[in-house]
C-alpha cells in the first residue's frame, strides 16, 4: 500500500472540517432509512432512483420523471455542486432513497446527500504500482441489497456496505501486475454480477466476461472473448499460438433481457491493432469487434455478430447494446444497409444503438442476432457493407493495410465518431438520440515485436478533417428505431462527446466539447435550455427525485479533445466537478 500523499492528507482534512458542519442526526437518519435494493428493483427501478449505469438493464438511459418538462426546463438552476477527485472522469452517479453514490477516478467512492451534496462516507482503494494507463476511468458501480458493488483498477470485485462504505467482501478476478483492470463497471442481473475484463495487452491471454454470485462474489462462469486453439472460433486466428492471441477487452457494461435470459456484451479490438503485426492476415479474429449474446446462466455464446472482421484501425465495438421491442420497418432510402429478407412491419425485440467507433447504428434481432438494418450517423469509410449470411460487416479494401508505415486516410479517428459516451432511447418517441462526430485520421502501423510482455501501442494516428468538410464536427441525430429515418439532426462546430439522458418530460440532455450542457426537445430538436460548465463532461448524466423534487446531475471534467479540428475551442485538464440542477 502506498503512503498517503500530502494532497490526500490535505483533502482528508478539508472533508473532515466540512463534515463537522453537517448535522450528524440528519446524515445518520438518511443512512438508517436506506432500504435494500431488490432484484425486482433492478429489473423495474422505482422512478425516483438511478440504480445502475444506464438506469435499466436494457440501457435506455431513460427516466420517466416528468416534473422537469418542455414548458419549464428553461428555468432550471443550480441546486448544488461538488468538487470531485482529480483524474480520468467518466462517472455515473447512482441514487437510492436520497443517497447519491459517486464513483470517481482510481476507485475513490463517496456517498453524499442527494439533495445538497453533504458527504456521508468515503472509500478510497489504495493505488497499486504499475497501474494501466486507462485503469482509473471508473465509469460505474451498481447497487444490490445493502451493497454497492464496484469493479476496480486492480481487477477486483469489491462489495461495500452501502450504509457505511466498509468492505464486506472482495474477489480478485484478473492480474493487475500485467495490466488487467476494470474500466466498465459491474451490472447485477438475476443475482449475478456481470463484468468484462480490460487490459489484456501484455500476457498470454485475451480477455473474458464473468458472472459472480452477487451475495458472495463466487465466480459462476467465465467466457473467453478470444477463443483458444480448438475452441469454436479459434480457427479465425490462424496458426497463432494461444499466448499471442491478445485483446478482446470488454470495457463497457453489459445489457440484459430477462425474457430471453440473454446478456449482451460488446468486445473491443485485437492486439496489436494490425493484422500484419499479429500475423493473422485474412482471419476474422473472433470475437473481437463483435456483439455477443450469452446465456445468463452458463455464459455460453448463443449468437454473435462481428461488426469488423480482422480489425486493423482501432475501431472498438464495446459500447452499449440497447434492447427495444419495436416494429421493424426500415426505409431503404433512410438507412445505409438493409436485410432484404426481413418481414416488414413485424414487431420484435431488437438490439440497437451505436456499438462501435465508426458511428453506425446497428439493429439486430435480439433473440437470434439476425442483421436487420444499419445507418451511418457521421462520416466514415471503414465499413462499406454487410455480409448477412456470414454475420459480419464488410470492410473497405481501399484502407486495407499491407505494409508497415503505409499511410491511409481512415474515418473516423481512433477516438471514434462515437466512444464511451452513450446513445439514449426514449419510449415516448421510439427514437435513439445519438451523439457523434465527423473526424478522420492519417493512420499507419508501426513496427512491433509481438512477444509475451510487449506493450500494445502499435500505430500512429494524426487527426484531420473529413473530405469536403464544412467544419461542423459535432452531431446529435434522432433516429427512428422502427424505420431508421432521421427525425432531426443538430449540427455544430464543437464536438459532441457527451452521453445522452432522455426523460418522461420529453427532453434530451447532452453535453459537448465547448462546455455546454443542453436540453433539447425530443420531438423537434429545438434547444430549450443551456448551461455553461467549467469543462466538457466525460460523465453520464442522470435524473432522480427526492421529496418530490426532480434533479438533473452531470459530472464535468474529462471528455475528448478535438482541438486539431477546432483549435479555437480550448479545454483545460482537471477540474472534475459534479453539477446538480433543479427547478426554482
Question: Residue locations for each model-derived region?
Answer:
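Short loop/turn segments that connect beta-strands within beta-propeller blades
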Residues: 114-116, 161-164, 214-216, 296-298, ...
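N-terminal cofactor/phosphate-binding cores enriched in small/glycine residues
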Residues: 59-173, 503
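Extracytoplasmic beta-rich repeat domains
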Residues: 81-94, 122-144, 170-185, 203, ...
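Bacterial N-terminal signal peptides
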Residues: 10-21
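Blade-level signature of beta-propeller repeat domains, shared across WD40, Kelch, NHL, RCC1
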Residues: 542-584
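Blade/loop signatures of beta-propeller domains
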Residues: 29-78, 225-230, 396-399, 465-466, ...
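Short coil/turn segments that connect the beta-strands within blades of beta-propeller domains
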Residues: 47-48, 97-98, 145-146, 190-191, ...
